[in-house]
Design a protein with these regions (language model features):
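Residue-level detector of alpha-helix boundaries and kinks
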Residues: 31, 35-38, 75, 104, ...
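Non-catalytic, usually N-terminal nucleic-acid engagement modules in DNA/RNA processing proteins
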Residues: 1-65, 177-180
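Hydrophobic/aromatic-rich, well-ordered segments within soluble, folded domains that form packed cores
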Residues: 12, 68, 197-201
Length: 202
């Protein structure tokens, strides 16, 4: 492969050509447990980039026959003051939804949910909230209780690829030999199509 410098306008152009219904603003996601000053600079940069993305999206117009909308991405780590500042600065660029970024990157789980609870208070109630990178079923349910509507995460496909199933009793490693000839349901507490029609046997 080769190196490419991607700047905010280029990010918007790429998403325009992909035909994304939801175009994500360019953002900086700092790692967990860094100094507040570093996270503060990431918030400033994200705010600046979001303005550029917003202006460029308005200026360019859709390529295809449908409209595309911009989701700003709130940053700020687990610093409540920076999260609030980021959200309040970015609301002006949102008409259809906002993303909560920079979580599930190694921070303490309780700090993550404190931040999600703050976002429930600060973000518009009449727009979808998209929590990026969170995928454990128990975390999804808890986040939904705090007003989150949308999620994305590599976890379901990555775990499935490695033979893991999420069940109401925890994770099952389906490739373990104990399941090879087992006609037990995948999850005895679930009535979904898969659990009713497929067993653990393979």
């Amino acid at each position: 492969g080769s190196s490419h410098f991607i700047y905010p306008e280029a990010s918007i152009d790429i998403q325009r050509h992909l035909g994304s219904d939801i175009v994500m603003a360019f953002d900086e996601c700092p790692p967990a447990n860094v100094k507040e000053s570093i996270v503060s600079k990431a918030v400033e940069r994200t705010n600046k980039w979001t303005r550029i993305c917003y202006d460029h999206l308005k200026k360019t117009g859709p390529i295809y026959s449908w409209s595309q909308t911009l989701f700003p991405i709130v940053q700020g780590g687990t610093f409540q003051n920076l999260r609030k500042q980021s959200a309040e600065s970015l609301i002006q660029f949102s008409s259809c939804g906002m993303a909560i970024g920079g979580l599930a990157v190694g921070e303490d789980k309780s700090a993550m949910f404190d931040t999600i609870a703050l976002m429930d208070e600060v973000l518009p109630k009449d727009q979808p909230r998209y929590l990026m990178g969170v995928g454990r079923p128990t975390d999804l349910v808890k986040a939904m209780r705090h007003g989150v509507d949308m999620f994305d995460c590599v976890l379901p496909t990555r775990n499935a690829r490695n033979g893991q199933l999420f069940t109401s009793n925890g994770i099952i490693n389906i490739t373990n030999t104990e399941h090879k000839d087992s006609f037990d349901p995948l999850d005895e507490n679930c009535n979904c199509y898969t659990c009713i029609n497929y067993s653990r046997a393979y």
